[in-house]
Amino acid sequence: MQKILRTGTLTLALLASVAIPQAANAFQESPMLKAMVEAGELPPVDERLPTNPTVVDAVEVGEYGGVWHRAYRGPGDRWGPTKLLEERVLKYVPDADGNITLVPAYIESYSVNEDSTEFTFTLLEGLKWSDGAPVTTEDVEFWYKDVFLNKALTPTIDPTFSPGGEPMKLEVKDDRTFTVSFAQPYVYFLNILAKDSTGEPSLDRPSFLFPKHYLSQYNDHYASAEDLSKAAEEFGVQRWSDLWGSKGPVTSWWQNPDLPVITAWKIETPAPGNVVTMVRNPYYWAVDQEGNQLPYIDRIEHRLFEAADSFNLMIVQGQIDMQMRYVNSSDFTFYKENEEKGGYHVGTWKSANVWSFVPNLNVQDEQLNKLFSDKDFRHALSVGIDRETINELGFAGLGEARSVSPISGSPYFNPEWETHWTEYDPDLANELLDKIGLSERDDDDFRLLPNGKRLQIVVEAYQDFAAPILEIAADYYRDIGIELLPRIIDRTQWDDNRDNNNFQIQYTPVDRLSVVSADPRNIMGNDSYAQQYYAWYETDGEAGIEPPQEAVIRQIWADWEKASVAGSMEEADAALNSMIGAFVDEGYVIGLVGEVSIPVIVKNDFMNVRNGLVEDDITRGVGLGQTQQFWIDQNKQ
């Protein structure tokens, strides 16, 4: 049975079972790997691939070899490289029109029972880790029992993977087949898998596959306390549990060249360093339509840069082969004018992000805490800024003024949500601020807090190009008596401030607005406007801060709980729409500009890059373009 949600530019198809096409009898491989086979360093390609590899339909059949040159911002910039190579049990793939479909990745098939309580998956026969070890359900069971349910590593399980309060259960059928079950229906589970069963080792996400043969030596169910203590010391962390997680030096692919992976490339020279390199995985499990083992490209090189001007210079000098990350929309004209000089062309993708101000409802400053929790204050912040000016000056007019809500083309798009509180109205902003008791002003015409101090708010961003945007915003807020203090800080510090509840407002692109059901946590407050409230919710009150009984965020959580146990897609979507509506109506996050046409730099010899796709964290950013089928045309160099 096929269930389809179709609206505009996005199509979500959930297939109960998908037959993997039979690959050609004879497979081809990169000359780089062929040389290793001839030297006796690798087995033949037929022995490295699964019996029936997954087939990736390349835009056109490519050629092997070459280095993909990119740029990165430092050790904290792991997500740029990560999204080039993530793999999921199921993944979103664009069709010829750019609509997305859910298809199997490293599995042979899957099935769902009638009430969506059981999901059965069969791994590809002959699937292998990058070191050649077989991938089996023993790795799945290791992840589930020794990581997911291990309180030392995963003290709390995210609500999106414990609907109704009960974590998912695992049953291993044989060495390739396993079943995940829930106590109640979970119609969104496949959507969530396509977002979160990734090559990035999030401990409480259904990654399903952790290499037991390698990681068990760092796990307390297998290793002695003495050995774990030695490992922690060796890797420079305080506790053995710190070895784990997406930032752990053992389980982070970005940091550990020894970690076996199933992705198209693996880390070769990790950060920090001026150049980070990734090299092809000789055991990657996919081929193109003619039986050529993927990826086409041998290596990916990320060169360090510190300032936006330096990155733009790299582009103009032809040093960037293909990149979307850090390519600034406000510089679109500059990029176009230098196409011939740099030997590239500029494509565009549509961003599902909304650049936004995220007030911290849990901010430690008592005066600001009270204001940020006041709907009228958030309303004033929203209507007190001219988004059209922000769009023109900050994004070259390539976006649109909008709230944080599902993008056009999403199954959950609502035009009324899109324009909620987005019309510039400084008179209304002043009226609202006076109404809530901020009518007193100092000699510079800034409003005074009840304690007599000037109303000052620090807004922090980590992008260089955000500086002029924040200055424009500061001018608008000055007109309504608020002193906005912009700060540009390092990305690592920005993340730490968010994680440690040490910020007032953060300027950031709010994502996951295409298929919201795949990851609603931004709307629920996680890593966003109410991190401490979400921690309280996630841990059943053991951590974080309890929200007031009247707080609308409680309704948002209740709506998700209804959606996550609904018996039908219609019932689930009704609850999800209620959740989104409550979030938008409260104005918890102040959206500014979204649906931006993102410039994509593509060298003229860099092939198979699709144009016009949707960029979102849900679909794993640039990964939606199927990077393993990108190739470099040596004849055009």
Report each predicted region and the residues it spans.
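N-terminal lobe/hinge region of extracytoplasmic solute-binding protein
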Residues: 29, 35-38, 43-114
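Ligand-site clamp/hinge motif
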Residues: 124, 250-256, 278, 283-334, ...
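Aromatic- and charge-enriched surface segment that lines or borders ligand/interaction sites
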Residues: 108-154, 179-181, 189, 314, ...
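Surface-exposed binding/hinge segments that line
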Residues: 159-244
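Short, well-ordered beta-strand elements
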Residues: 63-74, 108, 118-121, 140-143, ...
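Extracellular/periplasmic solute-recognition and catalytic clefts
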Residues: 143, 147-157, 170-172, 268-283, ...
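Detector for C-terminal structural segments
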Residues: 72, 259, 265, 271-276, ...
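Gram-negative bacterial Sec-dependent N-terminal signal peptides
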Residues: 1-24
